[in-house]
């Protein structure tokens, strides 16, 4: 049986820093300990050696096949610390369904120079953006209420939400009906700039008129799967890789990058409310 898991937290990571642009990495579905995970990790390290990187948003399914057994589980070394040893960056994780197959609470208790996850769902500020991490495996009414309050209280020019499951997806798992009904309207109403996720093992960008752009970066190292692009999908590819986002005062640029460093997709969006319409 899973252990009790703490609920929500806010992490103040920019209390002493003035508002500024921020660039970060995001990917999920990574924790296999196999060569493909190391290939993505090495590609991220090479990219961040040539480009500014503030942190990594880890999008869930952090440990395959069944989470971790505790904070001393050898998987921490084999499937996290070793693959990302060349990255001197903090990781800000979300929980995925495979994490719940083990003791999800251990992922909250574990601490290292790279890993810090204060709660099942939480928020933190980095420069011009505030990030809201959601638990989509157990998306409760309490969590929905927390997210609604947190988004309303935020004064950040940019708001980014991320979790594990996609709201919409062209991959094998497809759309998540509960998130389409509950989460999507909240993101649209709150002026959220992006929703980032994994779960489907591919890279995809969905940018449908009138909705929050959604970026799937499930190419972190687990086995790839087929996809069939749906309406609104502007990029979809079954390939290992990661996302890279740069946010400045008025624009945000998303790049989707393969393990050989090739930028497969790049697009720039204006800040929500800065003369743009959904």
Residue spans for each PLM region:
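Generic beta-strand structural signal
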Residues: 26, 58, 125-126, 208, ...
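N-terminal active-site segment of His-dependent metallophosphoesterases
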Residues: 2-75, 137, 142, 149, ...
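Residue-level detection of beta-strand scaffold positions
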Residues: 25, 132, 158-160, 254-256
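A short C-terminal boundary segment appended to hydrolase-like catalytic domains
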Residues: 238-278
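Residue-level marker for buried hydrophobic side chains located in beta-strands
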Residues: 24-26, 56-58, 93-94, 161, ...
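Extended active-site neighborhood of metal-dependent phosphoesterases/phosphodiesterases
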Residues: 18, 45, 64-159, 173-194, ...
